[in-house]
Structure formats: structure tokens, C-alpha cells
Amino acid sequence: MLGDHPVFPILLSIDLDASRSFYRDTLGLRLVREDPGRLVFACGGGTQLVISGSTTGTRDTQTQMAWRVPDIHAALADLRARGVRIEEYTAPDPVTTDGIADMGYAWAAWFIDPSRNCVAVVEPK
């Protein structure tokens, strides 16, 4: 049953004002709802990204969510033009070149949001 329904990520934020500014103003997402302790942004295909206020944030340094994009080079050019710093990794895995890693099944790149969530863009192969 659940396989027939969309999912939406929920990221934790220790500073909702900074998250609002980053996702709305820097990334250009449309803020569709704001409640005490929660922001909801519209994304492609009718999906949504929820940012939930947290006193602790995330302690995980792994990827929390990813956008599937048709052209990772164009996505990175847009992100960089918006002032987003793309992460570079040298070892052990993944290794990036100009911010992009070959994951075998896809090309991927990562950036960090104001609450230290690791977010990716992924171009399937």
C-alpha cells in the first residue's frame, strides 16, 4: 500500500529563520505553509520538503535527502550561482571531482544547509 504513495523528507532545523532564508531565498523553493516550529516548501512533482524545528538538530553527517535532477552539471552551476558551497570529498568514499562523485548508479553532489543537514543532488545514469 505505501509503495503507491509519495513520500516527503523532514529535515531538522536548529534555526528556522536561517532555514527559511536558505531554502526560500537561496535555493528558490516556494514556501507553501508556515506553522509554529515547521516550514513546508513545494518541490517538483507535487512533493514537499518539511523543515521541523529542533533543539538538537541532526547528529548524522550522512545524506538526509536528495533531489533527482536531469543534469547535475546544470544543477551545480545554478547552486553555485546562488552562493551554495558544494562539498568536496577526497577519501575514502565517495571521492568527488569538481564536487561530483560517481556512485555507480548515479552522479551525486552534496551541500550542507544552515542546520548541518547534508543534502544532495543526484543525476541517475
Language model regions located:
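Structural preference for long, well-ordered alpha-helical segments within the folded cores
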Residues: 21-22, 78, 115
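N-terminal beta-strand motif that seeds the catalytic metal site of vicinal oxygen chelate
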Residues: 1-17, 62-65, 122-125
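Core segments of cupin and vicinal oxygen chelate
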Residues: 4, 10-48, 74
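Conserved short beta-strand elements that form part of the metal-binding/catalytic scaffold
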Residues: 30-70, 87-88, 114, 118-123
